[in-house]
Amino acid sequence: MNSRRLVQKTLCFDKPERIPRHKGILPWAEKNYPEFVQRLHEVFPDDVVPAPSVYIEHLDTRGDRYKKGTYIDEWGCIFSNPLEGAIGIVQTPLVADWQDLDKFNPPQATLSIDREAVNAFCRQTDHFVLMGSFVRPFERFQFIRTMEHALIDLVEKPPELFELLDRIHQHYLKEVEVWASTDVDAISLMDDWGTQQGLIASPDVFRQIFLPMYKEYAEIARHHGKYLFMHSDGHIMDIMPDLIETGVDALNAQIFCMGVKELGEMYSGKITFWGEIDRQNLLPHGTRQDIQQAVYEVWLHLYQNGGVIGQCEFGLEANPENIFTVYETWDALSETERKA
């Protein structure tokens, strides 16, 4: 069974032959452990891959997203990065005063996707292919205003807030439409909604302002026969029912801070858990037995004839041997499931 079909059967809870793999390898790992990363790719090849981000028009970016220093992205948002191999944070707002809003325009170049190049890639691979960028209205709003100003805006709700959000959303609708018209298998959303204990903003803000946006992205995906994948960090238990109702097929979330058993009791069989394994404690500090037990718990509580993609992040301070153990354990559990 090829990778694309394997992932499709997983998303449909149709007894895939094994747990699909998707390694989240950050530049930090590639820089510090290049030989180990190569070994991971050879022994545990991915089943899920991103499409190439090939644009006909030039994206106006400056600097390197993962290098120490300043990086300016295609929207003009300014990121300050104190650490090599990671992503920086925005400290200077692109729209500092609402009077500056008229000067702000989303980057039209991101709509100039080279569809022929993307489609050729999809034809030549049997992997399950995600779109080559992420749709992130909540985070983009924060990048434009900074997180501090954005959260104040969501409390005060000035009319300019809704004008800005509409510009962001209308642009992302076009971007989703362009990607959905290619041969990729899935549309990708990415908004971090949680802190370690709960939501960054209230559930009402999420449901009244941002959930309708996600529903429109989902509608486009469905119209074109695409799956919908989403990443969201933090404790997002309060909005899980909304994401499932919206039509998110696979969710990459910090399942260990929410409780793997609790998630399984409520949502196993209703959504595919696209990873992960605890990257805050277990991957940096856990023993081999800790990692094996963690993977087993995910399988025990979340797997239901599918519904789990073996994903974890090889990022800052992760123990390389623990990453290897994650995928080694997933393969062992897949073998156990086949023999059952």
Language model segments and positions:
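An N-terminal domain-start capping segment
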Residues: F44-A51, I89-F104, S133-I144
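Alpha-helix termini
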Residues: K15, I25, L40, H58, ...
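A contiguous, low-structure linker/loop signature
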Residues: R62-T110, Q124-F128
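Active-site loop segments of alpha/beta catalytic cores
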Residues: M1-K31, K103-A340
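Segments that shape or occlude catalytic/ligand-binding pockets
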Residues: W28-D64
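Short aromatic-enriched loop/helix-cap "lid" or pocket-rim segments at secondary-structure transitions
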Residues: Y33-F36, R62-K67, L83-G85, F143-I144, ...
